[in-house]
A protein has these predicted regions:
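ALDH superfamily catalytic-core signature
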Residues: 4-146, 174, 202
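Conserved C-terminal structural/oligomerization subdomain of aldehyde/semialdehyde dehydrogenase
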Residues: 34, 84, 131-206
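A structured beta-alpha segment of the ubiquitous adenosine-cofactor-binding alpha/beta core
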Residues: 1
């Protein structure tokens, strides 16, 4: 079993299977969370933000893209509230290096320049007594389109992009169009709609 970059995952998989070994190789991630309007407000907002910000977003199962179906503004507003309560240095650690901090903040800036809306901005985060630390605050970016780099490339930081979808079919199409297929999730109180995502989404884990 391997989790890491796509380049190395291909090498591991090729070498393992050439010797008839069973292998699970997960390479890269851009995990999509499909959120429907009927999703439980507090639970959904809390889990999405925790998945985005936990380990400062430096984990393969972190939430990277939220696909909001129809009108989920009430959930987004709650997410903003949850994210603003996170304090770098207290309940959010640093990213791994100065280069990582610069790269992550570059994605946020690129999204802003491309027309996205920064709802919570983690750029320039500092911690008293640790001013030289590599901190990026939780970041929520709304009105993102699938072609923006912040939505299509792995960031590995506490950043989540929100893409709006008119209905569940469009949301599943957005998830399936991603070059990454590590994991996906669905937030709804409808078993039938959840089953549709489970059956139609192309992610390896749902």
């Amino acid at each position: 079993s391997f989790v890491g970059s796509t380049t190395v995952a291909k090498i591991v998989y090729k070498r393992a299977t050439s010797n008839l070994k069973r292998c699970v190789a997960l390479g890269g991630a851009k995990n999509h969370l499909i959120v429907l309007p009927d999703a439980h407000l507090e639970m959904t907002a809390s889990n999405v933000v925790a998945s985005m910000a936990g380990c400062a977003g430096q984990r393969c199962m972190a939430a990277s893209v939220m696909v909001g179906v129809d009108n989920v503004q009430h959930i987004i507003d709650k997410m903003v509230e949850e994210a603003k309560a996170i304090v770098p240095g207290k309940n959010l650690g640093s990213v791994i290096s100065a280069a990582a901090k610069e790269r992550i903040e570059g994605y946020i800036t690129a999204a802003e320049q491309a027309g996205a809306t920064i709802l919570v901005d983690g750029r320039g985060a500092t911690v008293p007594g640790k001013e030289d630390g590599y901190y990026v605050g939780p970041t929520i970016i709304d009105h993102v389109t699938p072609d923006m780099s912040v939505a299509s490339e792995e960031i590995f930081g506490p950043v989540i992009s929100i893409i709006r979808a008119k209905d569940l079919d469009a949301a599943i199409d957005i998830e399936n169009s991603s070059n990454y297929g590590n994991a996906a999730a669905v937030f709804t109180q409808s078993g039938g709609l959840a089953k549709q995502v489970m059956e139609r989404a192309s992610a390896g884990m749902i």
